[in-house]
Amino acid sequence: MLRYLTAGESHGPALITIVEGLPAGLAVEAGYVDRQLARRQGGYGRGKRMAIEQDRVRILSGVRGGLTLGSPVCLQIENRDWENWSTTMAPGPEADTGDRVVTRPRPGHADLAGVLKYGHKDVRNVLERASARETAARVAAGSLARRLLEELGVEILGLVVRIGPVQARIPEVPLDALRARIAESRVMCPDPYAGLSMVEEIDRARDDGDSLGGVFELHAFGVPPGLGSYVQWDRRLDGRLAGALMSIQAVKGVEIGLGFEGAAQRGSEVQDEIFHNGEKGFYRTSNRAGGIEGGVSNGQPVVVRVAMKPIPTLRRPLASVDLVSLTPSEAAFERSDICAVPAACVIGEAVLAFELARACLEKFGGDSMTELLDNHRRYLERIRANRAGG
């Protein structure tokens, strides 16, 4: 089974990712992962931390000569900011645990719940791990999954459709043109007019000492029918995707296809009618289901929208209580972003890629890429024969 674990604190020496279950023979290079990490660091509205970090991955195991070995792959991303925190965050007894103590939990963060759960006195012991800095490790893991999906003909595309009150209109243009517009935008928005308004809204939030959330949309093209299953609740593809995406820091909602919009419509307006001809086989003229029916991919693009709440760390702090004195106080302030929706979109791409890669490996199997690709090819041949009425 494909899985990963991450480790590391926000201001610790490094982030570590261990990916287990990749087949042998997958072409992997550090530069590919680095490009995804650089995308995560971009986007208008990021904080000063991104000016310090220049995320680069170091492959420590599981790859030789540019090809995976089938053994666990260990990835390391150094934290350049560690040199400014080495005394505070040292793992040994030399750590100055009285330095940079945080006792005023921030509303909306894991701060208070974390100290209550684990019995910490210093909120720093919570926020260092709960920080979205951890998502750099997830993007590294997702990059390997993305490489595997590319070999299977699956492409992932993410775009921002909303920041704060500004809603984008997605242009009906060819995929290459859409991809180019996203790349040109400072907020990953293919609507240039909405993109400018989003930047202005971020500037206003910065001036007000506030933050902004938004919505991003993920598309997976080339997903074969048959991923996931309806036979048990925990094997349904839509449930697995939603659960994985909801685990991203600050994400508060996930919808697939029409999502909540479909709840206000009649059944005849929501379902995707089925057609057939000798050339196409089975086909649809709409994709309101977002590529998943009954917990199983149906061969259409998988479409998911993800809602991210505004970042809780505010330059004009909200009310809190000091954990030591139990007196009213302003919440602590830690260096943070104004808006991280574009970065979250890149993280969402990685998370989606990993879950789809996991589903592909479960469906097709194979300890090597040769075996996986052969199984995948034979399955698609059978599907095409069925579509043609064979």
From Swiss-Prot:
GO biological process, one term: chorismate biosynthetic process
Family the entry assigns: Belongs to the chorismate synthase family.
Catalytic activity: 5-O-(1-carboxyvinyl)-3-phosphoshikimate = chorismate + phosphate
HAMAP family (alphabetical): Chorismate_synth
EC main group: lyase
Gene symbol of the encoding locus: aroC
Protein name, UniProt field: Chorismate synthase
Pathway(s) it belongs to: Metabolic intermediate biosynthesis; chorismate biosynthesis; chorismate from D-erythrose 4-phosphate and phosphoenolpyruvate: step 7/7
GO cellular component terms attached to this protein's record: cytosol
Keywords: Amino-acid biosynthesis, Aromatic amino acid biosynthesis, FAD, Flavoprotein, FMN, Lyase, NADP
Binding positions (FMN): 129-131, 249-250, 294, 309-313, 335
EC number(s) recorded for this UniProt protein: 4.2.3.5
Entry function: This reaction introduces a second double bond into the aromatic ring system.
Cofactor note: Reduced FMN (FMNH(2)).
Keyword field contains NADP: yes
SUBUNIT field: Homotetramer.
CDD domains in the cross-refs: Chorismate_synthase
Residues engaged in binding NADP(+): 40, 46
Domain of life where this protein originates: Bacteria
Cofactor field: FMNH2
SUPFAM superfamilies, per the entry: Chorismate synthase, AroC
Entry-linked NCBIfam families: aroC, PRK05382.1
Organism from which the protein derives: Desulforudis audaxviator (strain MP104C)
